[in-house]
Amino acid sequence: MTSPFAIFDLPVAFNVDQALLSERYLALQKSLHPDNFVTAEAQEQRIAMQKSTEVNDALKTLKDPILRAEAIIALNTGKTQDLEQKSTQDVTFLMQQLEWREELENIEQSQDENALESFAKRVKKETKEMLTALEAQLNEQQWPTAAQFCDKLRFLKKLADEISQVEERLFEL
């Protein structure tokens, strides 16, 4: 499989020029548009469709900081994250996860919008700090530690989604 960075002819780096990424995405999608292959043979149409899918997958990877970091780790180690087998070994973070889940549950039960807003801000701040730490680990080529940050960020992303769901339920009342 081709590197998402190579597909867009971008340097392998955690910080990606999003404007340049969008520009190159549009150019690739335009060149692979089905209208360009109307008179082409079936095999050529199929190849264009596969390339278009590859471009879309690469875009998704490069737009998401966690997926982007995992791509960098995979390129440098030859190993991909096995999400089914992953669980963080950081006991302190596991305890923090339990506390956050309990806090969110209590906020939802109490229907306290101010507490939810405050909690969401704390999670957002934690996520931002962890992204900064992840970038530092990637720059220092500390692949195992960077992978652990990816795991933690995946949890925080899921927690942020759960916060949004609680927010929606609170505002429905």
PLM regions and their residue ranges:
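C-terminal accessory/regulatory regions appended to core domains
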Residues: 1-173
